[in-house]
Amino acid sequence: EVCAGFPRAQGGYSKTACGLSLMHALRGDNSSLVNTAAALNLGKLASVWWEQPQSVRDGINRFRADVFGPMARELTFEFGANDSSELRELRETVITAAASAGDTWTLDEIRRRFAPLQEHGDYSLIHPDLLRTVLSQAVKHGREAEYEAVMGVYRAPATQAHQTSSMVAVGAS
């Protein structure tokens, strides 16, 4: 049902509000599958409404932040050694969706974790599962210094994943 709400609205078989109501009702669900589908559908909605007035786009992002922000705060950026793959995927999905929506807490935490990397190349606060999100959001919400720090990751990557993540981050800016 999570995957069908928005396609039904796109096809004219239901209203977008029905899909939004479903997403709101499912917020806080701890299933990675449900949250992945919700993030994908709400991300698509935000993307296709780019031509709408700024107030509408801001409203969609506030809604997305309301759906994913509380769970991002609950799960935190801290990965445990015994976290299941389901929990790791859930954390990555929720934090990425909250950041994409402009959730203040999530973006502040990204800035805090990016700062040591920017200042002296220290990746210790950035879990590999969140590297792409942290770099992308640092570039998106940062300035030239953040962009240059991510370009530094690209030029001297610790791993291939670092180089790929930095390319995605610079390309998404």
List the predicted regions and their residue ranges.
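Long, ordered, helix-rich scaffold segments
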Residues: 1-173
